[in-house]
């Protein structure tokens, strides 16, 4: 896992609590630590939210996305596990995913 993530673990935890995150994982080059470009690479997160009221999902999802982009000052890909339909993509994610937060 890249140092940038390690340095911001406490801030990540605070965002997870604020946005009712049940589980947040990192995957991709930032998780693997290889081929991550400090200047250009995005960061890929897998997120599961706790129970939310109808109509709160969009605000919560986009609020967390914006907060993570502000925290890391770079593009963030925020993926929900149930949205993954491609088995090859899921296999790729599973090869290097790491838990950052679990409630």
Enumerate the language-model features and the residues they cover.
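Catalytic core of pol beta-like nucleotidyltransferases
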Residues: 1-25, 31-38, 50-103
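Short hydrophobic/aromatic beta-strand micro-patches
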Residues: 46-48
């Amino acid at each position: 896992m890249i140092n940038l993530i390690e340095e911001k673990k406490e801030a990540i935890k605070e965002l997870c609590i604020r946005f009712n995150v049940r589980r947040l994982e990192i995957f991709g080059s930032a998780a693997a630590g290889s081929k991550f470009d400090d200047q250009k690479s995005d960061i890929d997160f897998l997120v599961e939210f706790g129970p939310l009221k109808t109509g709160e999902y969009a605000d919560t999802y986009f609020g967390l996305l914006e907060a993570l982009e502000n925290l890391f000052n770079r593009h963030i890909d925020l993926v929900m596990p149930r949205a993954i339909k491609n088995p090859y993509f899921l296999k790729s994610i599973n090869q290097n995913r790491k838990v950052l937060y679990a409630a």
